[in-house]
Amino acid sequence: MKIIGGPASQLLASRTARALGTEPVLCEFNRFPDGELYLRIADEIENEKVTIIQSTPTDSDFVALLQLIDACEGAAEINVVIPYMGYARQDKKFKPGESISARAIARCINASRIFTINIHERSILDHFPCPAVNLDAASLVGEYIAGSGLENPMLVAPDEGAQGLVKNVAAGHGFDHDHLQKTRLSGDTVVIKTKNLDVTGRHVVLVDDMIATGGTMAESVRMLKAQGAIDVHLACVHPVLTRNAALRLFNAGVKDIIATDTLEKAESLLSVAPLIAEALKRL
């Protein structure tokens, strides 16, 4: 199995290759004077099984993925791992005339099989023109929290939609878990608090699949601290963290931010490489 890392996932590809006892394939990435992307696979892959690992947080990264798939023509098998898939949040029409961007992107990516990691909406997998599997990094996040030294942490989902992820993170560790609920007290007064459990005197870990602007999370952090939490930590799979999101969160009182390397950020403290490697070993 040859591992090829795209420009957005160089470290993750290297870690995955190491977990499989091999080295990543060498590639050249450059840009033409007009800004167009140039890439070349420098190693021989003819009749080999290859796996491309490339997140697509930007349009350019998506183009790079398409180019890498095309450059692998002649390989015996082409697997594609998209650790973080951009445009996945536009999985339905919110207004008449809109594009379902996740569907449009998925339809363009064809390979022997595709792997995603905690994709925002699982129904997107049905739009790929080939078999697609979603891997769950929840156990990795749970293991990290268990080894972090936090005493009796409480895991909290920011909304009902993230409850499934929080339950999976807590599984096998006995962590208490709950989700936040908004209660409108008046026309302009809304209180955010845990639905069932009291956060007073607890180390709280807010868990979600991704953190983007951090606005909602920052408000939740302030509320939890005001309600008596000792401290509030954030854990996510995908650290999108646009613009000044990290600064906004720390200003709100977050103790720390824990994320995986589906996107390579300063907050990427744990790697999904073992998860990818295990999936590839099963092929």
Curated annotation (Swiss-Prot):
**Does the keyword Plastid feature in the UniProt annotation?**
no
Bilayer-crossing regions: none
Any single Gene Ontology cellular-component annotation: ribose phosphate diphosphokinase complex
Report which reactions are catalysed by this protein.
D-ribose 5-phosphate + ATP = 5-phospho-alpha-D-ribose 1-diphosphate + AMP + H(+)
The UniProt annotation places Mg(2+) 1 binding at H120
Q: What does this protein do?
A: Involved in the biosynthesis of the central metabolite phospho-alpha-D-ribosyl-1-pyrophosphate (PRPP) via the transfer of pyrophosphoryl group from ATP to 1-hydroxyl of ribose-5-phosphate (Rib-5-P).
Report the protein name in the record: Ribose-phosphate pyrophosphokinase
Species of provenance? Methanosarcina acetivorans (strain ATCC 35395 / DSM 2834 / JCM 12185 / C2A)
The primary gene name is: prs
